[in-house]
């Protein structure tokens, strides 16, 4: 469930795609399966592979601890290549990534466990082009469904036998 969201750009255009936004600050919660430990692992580069279809981080330098601040990795989604840097971590509680989706947007993603079976997921993104501002507006409008998809994928993965 999205707790709050804020997008900066022109006002909406009644019934059409959302108006382009240059910056979006989005926050919402994802419920986690009961007893899943360590829960923060689900939101590390390697841990996300357990539940995020198509997620395949590549590390340009060896990374024994993939959530160590300073760790760099890359992902691809369609034609968009994204470079990620672990910028902060509080072990067992939170992790923050800086990310640049080349030619599209840049910003941070922060995941914080609440200690009661949920994670708060915050995106703070800035569009790098006019075209990206339209895509960012669509992402912001769909953020609640985006997190619901995450929640369902995590729940489905928790029900799978270990590989």
Label the model's feature ranges.
Residues 2-65:
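Hydrophobic ligand-binding cavity/cleft-lining segments
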Residues 10, 160-163:
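Compositionally biased non-globular segments, especially hydrophobic aliphatic-rich helices
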Residues 24-26, 71, 95, 109, ...:
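Short beta-strand micro-motifs in enzyme catalytic cores
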Residues 25-27, 79-84, 104-110:
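Short, surface-exposed coil-to-beta transition loops
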Residues 31, 47-53, 58-101, 156-161:
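Glycine-rich portal/gate segments that line the openings of hydrophobic small-molecule binding cavities
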Residues 33-37, 87-92, 112-119:
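A short, structured loop/turn motif at beta-sheet edges
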Residues 98-152, 156:
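Beta-strand/loop substructures that line and gate deep hydrophobic ligand-binding cavities in soluble
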